[in-house]
Amino acid sequence: MKSFEPYLIRIEEALESVLPQPAKDARTAPVIESMRYSLLAGGKRIRPVMVLAFCQLCGGDPQQALPFACAVEMVHTYSLIHDDLPCMDDDDLRRGRPTNHKVYGEAMALLAGDGLLTKAFETALSFSGAPEDALRGARILAQCAGADGMVGGQCIDLDSEGKNVDLELLREMDQG
């Protein structure tokens, strides 16, 4: 991962700036804090690193792809927050510390996930390049995260609880 260190530094700085503190409105401070708790909890950041690395590999400027890299990480984090909820996998720990709903409560965790999902699209659409590229990227992200992608995979996961799961079903869950 050492060769990806410059990417990781850029990603962490960009993620930190996406959700500045203090919140603009004191009434929304709890949801911003909850969003930051999970988004800035560390992790390998494989997904956003891949976005920047592929951009560079294709001859692009990784700095320009940073909004998309951050958006991908925000969608991933939102999915983890929701996946940890009692109505899903009911996990108590994530990345070595209490899950979002254990710290902030279920309602705030749900809002934090929703907030990260919408912030992801706001961030992706802040891309400074050609507007059609931003729209194309946002559409791809929506398709991958939606009912035919990640959400669909979670649905299959819930439906298969307590059942024998074969390799084909695991592939369906993974691919949505």
Q: Where on the chain are the PLM-derived regions?
A:
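N-terminal amphipathic/basic leader segments beginning at the initiator methionine
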Residues: 1-23
